[in-house]
Curated annotation (Swiss-Prot):
<keyword id="KW-0449">Lipoprotein</keyword>
<keyword id="KW-0336">GPI-anchor</keyword>
<feature type="disulfide bond">
    <location>
        <begin position="92"/>
        <end position="97"/>
    </location>
</feature>
<dbReference type="GO" id="GO:0032991">
    <property type="term" value="C:protein-containing complex"/>
</dbReference>
<feature type="disulfide bond">
    <location>
        <begin position="22"/>
        <end position="47"/>
    </location>
</feature>
<keyword id="KW-1003">Cell membrane</keyword>
<dbReference type="Pfam" id="PF00021">
    <property type="entry name" value="UPAR_LY6"/>
</dbReference>
<feature type="lipid moiety-binding region" description="GPI-anchor amidated serine">
    <location>
        <position position="99"/>
    </location>
</feature>
<feature type="signal peptide">
    <location>
        <begin position="1"/>
        <end position="18"/>
    </location>
</feature>
<feature type="propeptide" description="Removed in mature form">
    <location>
        <begin position="100"/>
        <end position="125"/>
    </location>
</feature>
<feature type="disulfide bond">
    <location>
        <begin position="25"/>
        <end position="33"/>
    </location>
</feature>
<dbReference type="InterPro" id="IPR045860">
    <property type="entry name" value="Snake_toxin-like_sf"/>
</dbReference>
<keyword id="KW-0472">Membrane</keyword>
<protein>
    <recommendedName>
        <fullName>Lymphocyte antigen 6 complex locus protein G6c</fullName>
    </recommendedName>
</protein>
<feature type="glycosylation site" description="N-linked (GlcNAc...) asparagine">
    <location>
        <position position="88"/>
    </location>
</feature>
<dbReference type="InterPro" id="IPR016054">
    <property type="entry name" value="LY6_UPA_recep-like"/>
</dbReference>
<feature type="domain" description="UPAR/Ly6">
    <location>
        <begin position="20"/>
        <end position="111"/>
    </location>
</feature>
């Protein structure tokens, strides 16, 4: 009886943990999450969030599901010598635990794109 109860509990835990989802996108300044998707975690994997910085200035973030080929490995201030970027990676294993920030307002995106267009015209002048 005890073995049957243990087997049932194990099956229930596997069923519940098999449906954990993570956010997947590249998060950029002003634009927010680009190409926003949802991915399902494979057994034994975790959601990941990697923030990239130049000095103390945030450049971008990557949110995704860890995979057997690229598992989530927590790291603080890991520096890429080639690009000079510093990476901080965090891992979590709850449903949608790597939640992205809310989508930017259309007005803010319009201001950014208008400024970018103005800069482009100024450089061409």
């Amino acid at each position: 009886m005890r073995a049957l109860l243990l087997l049932s509990l194990s099956a229930l835990l596997c069923w519940v943990s098999a449906d954990i989802r993570c956010h997947s996108c590249y998060k950029l300044p002003v634009l927010g999450c680009v190409d926003r998707k949802s991915c399902r975690l494979e057994p034994g994997q975790q959601c990941l969030t990697t923030h990239a910085y130049i000095g103390k200035m945030w450049v971008f973030s990557r949110l995704d599901c860890g995979t057997p080929g690229e598992p989530c490995k927590p790291a603080v201030n890991q520096t890429n010598q080639k690009g000079g970027l510093t990476y901080n990676t965090t891992c979590c294993s709850q449903d949608n635990c790597n939640s992205p920030a809310p989508r930017p307002t259309p007005a803010l995106t319009l201001v950014f794109l208008t400024s970018l267009a103005g800069l482009g015209l100024w450089l061409l002048h």
